[in-house]
C-alpha cells in the first residue's frame, strides 16, 4: 500500500526524512527543509537587512544548496540581503578547475556575482606546486590553512558583512567527536557556534545549514535537480576526519537523531576554569585573524619561500631550529663568497 | 568535495593525526633486576612508559594511584562508610584488593573508612546462569573484613541479603524486565538500565548507611562513557559521568571512581601480581551479545576498543578530555527526574530545531496556511516534558512507542 504524505496534503510520500523519520511528498519536503533554514536564520539573527553576504562556494552539494536556498529565502521572506558567491581556486588540476565550472554555472543560474580568488595570486603558489614540494603527506595542512585565510581576504576585498559557509549538521557533529578524540578544548568550545568571529577586526562566519542533515541536503539537491560537483579531491583524503566520520555514520544508522544529540551535547559542554582559553588576535605580518604570532599561513608561506616546506608542520621549536640552521648556512656561504672576492 | 576544515589544524601546525601505535597486551614477564630497588626477581613488570620493576615496586606504584585519586581531591571524609560495588570483573577485584590493602596498613598509612561490598545479581535481566556462589564465597572469605551483600537487579531494596543468607532464585520476570521489554531500542534499554543500576546502588547504600559508593571504572571505561554520553545527548552531565566524584545519587550519596587513572595493562598486571580470579560471567554487558551495531553504546565501545588496539594514545586523550570538562549547571537549576542531571532543555536552540523539524514536517506545503506558528507549537511541545532532560525524554519517547 502506498504511504501517504505525513502532512495530509493528499499526495503520496516520495521519501522518508532522515531527520524526523516522517514520510513526505517532494513538495512538502521542500517546504519543510526551507522553513527550517529560514527558522535557523531568523531565530539566530544571522543576518541583518541591507547586509552584503558572501556565500563560500566550492561547487559541492552543501554550498550549492546553500546558495540556492539563501537566494530563495531572501526573495520569499524579503531579507534584503545582497548575496555574492566567493570561491577559492587552490590550483588543483583535475579537481578544482572542474568544480569551478559548476560554481560558474551556479552564478548564471542564480544571477549572483562571483568572485574567484586563487592561491596563485594570493600566495604565489598553487596546490599542485606545493604538493610537488612537500609530497602527499601534510599537503592538506597548506590547503586548509590557506583556504581559511583566502576566504577572509576575499570577504575583505568584496566588502561583505559576513561569510556564509555550507557546514551541515553532520559536519558539526563530526567536528565535536573529532575534537574530543584529540582533546582540543579550544575548538570544542567554538565548533558548535552558529556564528563565529565578528569582533572588531574579523568578518563573522555563519552556518545557516547547521541543523540540516547531509542526507537531506543531498535529497534536496537531487529532487530540485541542482547542479553540483561531487568528486573527491585528487590529493590525500584526511584520515583523521575520516575516522570520526565513519563512527558518526555508524551511529546514525542506529539512531538518526544522534547527529542533533551530539550537537546538543557539544553545546552543553562546559570547561573547568583551569582549561586554557585561546586568545584571538591579529597576525602582525599579514593582519588577518590568528591565535598565534605569526599566523599559520605566514609560517607555511615562509617555509615554502625559503625552500623549507616542513617549517610550519610540527612543533614551532623545530621550525625555529630549521630557520637558524638555514641562516647559518647562508651566512657561511656569504663568508665564503667574500673570501673568494678578495682574490 | 574537500572536507578539510579549519578544525583540522592544530596550533602546533599540521593536520592532527591519530598516531598509530598499539599497547602490547597480555602478560609477558621476564626475570631480571628491578630498576628501582635493584633487587633481582623472577618477574619484572614492564608497564608502557615505565622501566621494568619488581612486584613490590609495581604494587606500590599502582596502589599509590588509587590513594592519590582519593587523597588529592579530599573527597573521602575520615571514617566514611563506603559501599563497594563488586561485579566480579578484574577491575572490581583490583579495587577490592586495593581497598583491603589500604585498610590493613599501619595506623599512619591506613585509609580510614569502613567498607561493605555488594554484588548486583543481574541474571534475570541478562537471561543467563545465576552467579557462581562458590566464587563469591571464596571472595568473601579472602576479604573477610568486609561484609558481603547480594541483591538481584530489579527487586526492591528490601530483598538485600548477606551472602551467607542468600540463595539464588530462578526468576522469570520482575518489574525492571517488564519495563525493559517495553523499550523499543537497545540504546534506550541500556541507557535506562544504567540509570536503574545507579538508583539501586543508591538505595542499597542508603539502607546500609553508606555515604560513599566506590565504582571500579578505569580510564578506558570512562573514555567509552564520555563518548557514549555525548552520543546520547548527555553532554551537559557528561562531566559527572566520568569524574572522580558524581553526586547525582539519591539522598546525597556520592559515587566515587578511585580507579579512574588506571589503565587496562595495570589492571592486568595487578590481577596477575595478586593472583586475583575475575569471575567469568562478568565479562559481558547487557545487550552486548546483540552485536556492535545494535546500539549506540555497543558501537561506541567497539569504536574505543578499536582505538585502544590501533591508536592507543587516542584513548587516553579522550579520557583526559573528560577531565577538562565540568558540569553545566548552577545550583538553583532544576534536576531531571530520572537521572538527576541539571535541566537545560528550554534554553537550547538545537532542541527547538528538532521540535521545529517535526512541526514543519507535519505542516508540509500547508505551512503558510497554518493557523499557529510552528515555532509556538514546538515550544509548547518542549514544555510537555519539562521534568526530564533531553536524553531521558528520548527514553520516555521510546516507551510510548513500544507499548
From Swiss-Prot, chain A:
EC number of the protein: 2.7.7.-
GO biological process, one term: tRNA wobble uridine modification
Keyword Transmembrane helix attached: no
Location within or outside the cell: Cytoplasm
Keywords: Cytoplasm, RNA-binding, Transferase, tRNA processing, tRNA-binding
A cellular component annotation (GO) from this entry: mitochondrion
A GO term for molecular function: tRNA binding
Keyword Mitochondrion: no
UniProt-listed InterPro entries: CTU1-like_ATP-bd, CTU1_C, Ncs6/Tuc1/Ctu1, Rossmann-like_a/b/a_fold, TilS/TtcA_N, tRNA_thiolation_TtcA_Ctu1, UPF0021_CS
Pathway annotation: tRNA modification; 5-methoxycarbonylmethyl-2-thiouridine-tRNA biosynthesis
Major enzyme class: transferase
Domain of life: Eukaryota
Primary localization: cytoplasm
NCBIfam families in the cross-refs: TIGR00269 family protein
UniProt family annotation: Belongs to the TtcA family. CTU1/NCS6/ATPBD3 subfamily.
Functional summary from the UniProt entry: Plays a central role in 2-thiolation of mcm(5)S(2)U at tRNA wobble positions of tRNA(Lys), tRNA(Glu) and tRNA(Gln). Directly binds tRNAs and probably acts by catalyzing adenylation of tRNAs, an intermediate required for 2-thiolation. It is unclear whether it acts as a sulfurtransferase that transfers sulfur from thiocarboxylated URM1 onto the uridine of tRNAs at wobble position.
Name this protein carries in UniProt: Cytoplasmic tRNA 2-thiolation protein 1
Lineage: Eukaryota, Metazoa, Ecdysozoa, Arthropoda, Hexapoda
Curated annotation (Swiss-Prot), chain B:
Keywords: Cytoplasm, tRNA processing
Gene Ontology CC entries for this record: cytosol
GO biological process, one term: protein urmylation
GO molecular function terms attached to this record: nucleotidyltransferase activity; sulfurtransferase activity; tRNA binding
Pathway(s) where this gene product acts: tRNA modification; 5-methoxycarbonylmethyl-2-thiouridine-tRNA biosynthesis
Keyword Cytoplasm: yes
Subcellular localization, as worded in the UniProt entry: Cytoplasm
Origin superkingdom: Eukaryota
Listed SUPFAM superfamilies: Adenine nucleotide alpha hydrolases-like
Entry keyword DNA-binding: no
Family label: Belongs to the CTU2/NCS2 family.
Known function: Plays a central role in 2-thiolation of mcm(5)S(2)U at tRNA wobble positions of tRNA(Lys), tRNA(Glu) and tRNA(Gln). May act by forming a heterodimer with NCS6/CTU1 that ligates sulfur from thiocarboxylated URM1 onto the uridine of tRNAs at wobble position.
Designated name of the protein: Cytoplasmic tRNA 2-thiolation protein 2
Species of origin: Drosophila ananassae
Taxonomic lineage of the native organism: Eukaryota, Metazoa, Ecdysozoa, Arthropoda, Hexapoda
